[in-house]
């Protein structure tokens, strides 16, 4: 069993929980050399990132949604089930909260979990390919002009965008930046590419969902936007550069502890985003008698 940890948060207590569980089930627990060294984790086998990706039968990602996405990219060449454990804010993609880790591990051991398949975006730029399980974003940089791009679908011109940001999202990523820009929520079990402009000035002004067999090509015609994959800045784009985006089926495997409640959890979390408070302030909205019930 491999561990992928948030690069800054101290998840040592959770690592101890996982280590105790693996030791009682005769499972070897491994992590990257960097994580083992950074947190001085005893009893873990330290592997290179390449060894971790090629030898694990499963991954537990401790952190937030970004940690989970990184774990899925890590094993995308040989997909294995990934369990996301949230130690961040709302955690749309992570399956369980940190406080529920022990219960989740018990259910996995008892065979009371399932695995769902996820597709991803294959992004071509500059002669190389990268993967994105959430989204690809071309974002306006102050002083560099708006994002201007022509979109072609299956080799045919589709339309033009002029906006502050252009987001190409997977269905799983439809609850992230695309949703904040007014895009729809798409069932994560759907195959397809969601294209959403943020603050469009002219051109296409609405989200469109394109099929998995419709490769996309973006040609930048203006601006010098930042180029992000799954929230990670990878560089800047110049006018005349192109980005291709295609769909890859079954690129990742997600562990579900209670799949029947996944839609309910997402709906509640999306509703919380509409409240004018920070996630840490949400508890203040809960009546005191209900809070006492939670504490018991």
Task: Briefly describe each language-model feature range.
Residues 28, 79-83:
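Proline-centered loop/turn at the N-terminus of a beta-strand
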Residues 7, 65-67, 90, 172-174:
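Short glycine-rich anion-binding loops that position phosphate/pyrophosphate groups of nucleotides
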Residues 1-58, 70, 99-114, 125-129:
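ATP/NTP phosphate-donor binding region
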Residues 11-14, 66-72, 175-179:
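Short glycine/serine/threonine-rich phosphate/pyrophosphate-binding segments
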Residues 3, 61, 168:
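Redox-cofactor binding/interface segments in oxidoreductases and associated redox assembly factors
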Residues 88-165:
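Catalytic core of DAGKc-family lipid kinases
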